[in-house]
Structures are given as C-alpha cells and as structure tokens.
Amino acid sequence: MVDEAKLHQFVGQMLSDLGGAASVALVRIGDALGLYKTLHERGPATVDELAAAAGVNQRYLREWLSHQAASNYIAYDPATQKFTLPPEQAMVFAIEDSPVYMPGAFSCMASILDNQPKVEPAFKTGAGVAWGDQASCLFCAVARFFRPGYHNNLVANWLPALDGVVAKLEKGAKVADVGCGHGVSTVIMA
C-alpha cells in the first residue's frame, strides 16, 4: 500500500531537484553573458535597464530574471520593478576572488551530464572513465570552481596545517598536480 504522505513528500523532493537542475543551465547563461556582474556593478535595475546595460534581449532576460528571483538568486522589488543582486549572492555569482564564488561548480554539474554517455557503459564493464576522458568543459570548470578556495586558503591556511609541508616546499620540491584544475594550486604555491 502506498503511503500518500510519503509519496507527496518524495514528489516534492523530486520537483525541488528538477528546479535545481534547471538552475544549472540558467546560472551558466547568466555567468557567460555577464548578467550577475552587470547587475552587481550597476545596482538595482529594471528589465529594460539591465537588458541595455548587458546588451541582451529584453524578453529572454525577463524570463531569466524571473527564474533567478523565484530561486532567491537575486532580489526583486515589486514597488520599483527593479532587480538587485544582494551582497551575499554577489559573493557567490559576481565576485571572482570571493571564497564562495561558485559559477564553476555549475559548469562541473553540466560536465556530469555531458559525461553520462561515457559513464553509463562503465556501469556494465566496471572499467571506469579516465580523468583525461571526461567532458572537456570539466577541466576549466574544476579550475574555476576550486581557484577561489585555493586563492583564499591554500598558502594561508591549508599548507601550514600540514606538519612540515611548508618547509619542504620552501626548500624546493617536485609537485604533481593531477585533476586539480589546470595547475591553479601549483601556480599559487609557486
């Protein structure tokens, strides 16, 4: 017998997951077109004002802004009909040196979808998918996602927390950077 309450709860979870999945593409579009940065730099804007500032089509922008506001990624003031990127969201979407800058994470998620045709056969064979065989956008996405954390923490916090590692690196060491995002961490350490 089906428990209706559990079924509705699970369907709600699935709808939430689907909403999150839709956000992947829309965040990537906003990032690629500079919409978050334009809204952050410009401040509160109507659809028409932001469309002009960003050089995008007003109709598509309205749909994008509506989704972003419904997802609480941006704020909307119905009295002024203006959209705003609050400071907390700006740290996540517009300020590249922020320790919580996350557009790269959304590209990582897109890579997971792109990798499905490679991963699916691995379920049968058990052979796995080599790092170098991943979707090409994954490597840039990993670099972009991890760079803020490396920039804000690697030298200042993470390396000093490892006993003796800083001294070894200062003497000169060979480092293998595998799967860490185009050598971003190695460049920061240098």
Question: Where is each model-derived feature located?
Answer:
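Conserved Class I S-adenosyl-L-methionine-dependent methyltransferase catalytic core
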Residues: 2-5, 16-38, 53, 62-173
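Intrinsically disordered, low-complexity terminal regions of plant proteins
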Residues: 7-10
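Short helix-to-turn junction characteristic of helix-turn-helix DNA-binding domains
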Residues: 39-43
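A short acidic, leucine-rich amphipathic alpha-helix
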Residues: 47-52
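Conserved beta-strand/loop positions that form the S-adenosyl-L-methionine
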Residues: 178
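Conserved SAM-binding loop of SAM-dependent methyltransferases across substrates and taxa
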Residues: 182-190
